[in-house]
Amino acid sequence: MRIFFASSESIALEVLKKVADQHNVVGVLTAPDKPSGRGLFLRANDIKVEATNRNITVLDPVVLNSDVVEIVKRLNPDLMLVFSYGKIFRQEFLDIFPMGCINVHPSLLPKYRGPSPIQTAILNGDTVGGITVQKMALEMDSGNILSQSQFEIKSFNTSADIFRYVSLNSFNLVLEALSKLDKGNIGIEQDSRQATYCSFFNKQHRILDFNLSAFEIKNKINACNPWPLARAKLDDDEIIFHRADFIRTNDYSDQAIGKIILFDPSRGILVKTGDGILLLLELQRAGRKVMDYKSFYNGNRDLIGKIFS
């Protein structure tokens, strides 16, 4: 099977490696190089680097125009595998592939169709996540399901944790999907009546309101890691939060909202919220290194009694 691979994100790197090991990847479509680092030098993404190292043809156009279509046609692919590419394909492009196109989507479709299923699952406090390989359709994430699996989301898991899990555990589902397509199996139609949707994450998501419940705040903190990272002011410093958990309790009801009330060596730095106690587990002062809560407290012994704003 001649596979054309489309991705711009490192979440797909392990899948590219394993697919290329077992199949004929005839080309890779990815995003153009982007400025990176202090010098803002152009840098290729991990997908492009891996494909180049394997001598696979790489296309990184700004626009998927007719010239790109002709180049892909000349590669004579059977199928396109898409995993976090980041652009919408026109029908003219999808029609290139005689066996069709499949997409890896990190949710239990039809739940969380759209661009941020992992972040949205954590933001909503879901305890179960999933990976779906679907046939691509013109309507976003609405194609027939070829393979699917689910996994546990723990209370303290971040989006970064789930990205890593999905990256390492998608390949077998891709193999299952490819095998089904090779045998003429078209998959199972989604029940669109059960569909839910998610939108792009942006910098507004990083703003915290300590009047919310501890459950809601920890969800936002964990959803915003690795980007855009939730934060709040403490005195004149910006504190960036990387991981949190929570306690359902009515204790400390007389304390001010946003107040750091206790350091618990076995649980975290405790903060009063509108409902319950937030446990800060990993955090940093802006411009400093990320620390676990014990290291952060050891370097900031005057925390107790201060109030986040």
Curated annotation (Swiss-Prot):
GO molecular function: methionyl-tRNA formyltransferase activity
Binding site for (6S)-5,6,7,8-tetrahydrofolate: 107-110
InterPro entries, sorted: Fmt (IPR005794), Formyl_trans_C (IPR005793), Formyl_trans_C_sf (IPR037022), Formyl_transf_N (IPR002376), Formyl_transf_N_sf (IPR036477), Formyl_transferase-like_C_sf (IPR011034), Met-tRNA-FMT_C (IPR044135), Met-tRNA-FMT_N (IPR041711)
Reaction catalysed by this enzyme: L-methionyl-tRNA(fMet) + (6R)-10-formyltetrahydrofolate = N-formyl-L-methionyl-tRNA(fMet) + (6S)-5,6,7,8-tetrahydrofolate + H(+)
SUPFAM superfamilies assigned: FMT C-terminal domain-like (SSF50486), Formyltransferase (SSF53328)
Domain of life assignment: Bacteria
CDD domains assigned: FMT_core_Met-tRNA-FMT_N, Met_tRNA_FMT_C
EC number: 2.1.2.9
GO cellular component terms, semicolon-separated: cytosol
Disulfide bond annotation, renumbered to this chain: none
Alphabetic keyword roster: Protein biosynthesis, Transferase
PANTHER family, A to Z: METHIONYL-TRNA FORMYLTRANSFERASE, METHIONYL-TRNA FORMYLTRANSFERASE, MITOCHONDRIAL
Task of the protein: Attaches a formyl group to the free amino group of methionyl-tRNA(fMet). The formyl group appears to play a dual role in the initiator identity of N-formylmethionyl-tRNA by promoting its recognition by IF2 and preventing the misappropriation of this tRNA by the elongation apparatus.
Family according to the record: Belongs to the Fmt family.
Matching NCBIfam families: fmt (TIGR00460)
HAMAP family, per database record: Formyl_trans
Protein name listed in UniProt: Methionyl-tRNA formyltransferase
Upper classification of the organism: Bacteria, Pseudomonadati, Spirochaetota, Spirochaetia, Spirochaetales
